[in-house]
Amino acid sequence: MPRLFPLLALLPLLAACQMDSRQQVLATTNTQAAQRAMSTRAFDTGDRARVFTAVIASLQDLGFVIDRADNVLGTVSATRFGGGLVRFTVTVRPGEGARTIVRASGQLNHHELSDPAPFQRFFEALSQALFLQANQID
């Protein structure tokens, strides 16, 4: 019992170190908004199947092995080995009008990718693949 009193005295100090829940929500929202902006692109085509095929081709061009591809749901999961385990999941969905929205998420060794470079490389490869498809260049 005497040992319990010093521990109880430290309890208010620990509570003072805790972040306010409102601050947590605001910090998370900013981070999520930045992540969403970095990992989402809209393409000016209503042909979701063509974009879906281009996503698969782009991931393969970048050295990924396709784990799962579901055209009905519009999701592709892929893995790349070497320099760490990289997993990418891409969702293709219809947007407003004749647009298609592509959103990617990634993990490096089970940690969320926050570096914009892998997303930029993927979207550049996807844009090139869509351009080649539109111009029927194989």
State each model region's role.
Residues 18-138:
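Ser/Thr-rich, low-complexity intrinsically disordered terminal regions
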Residues 1-7:
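Bacterial N-terminal signal peptides that target proteins for export
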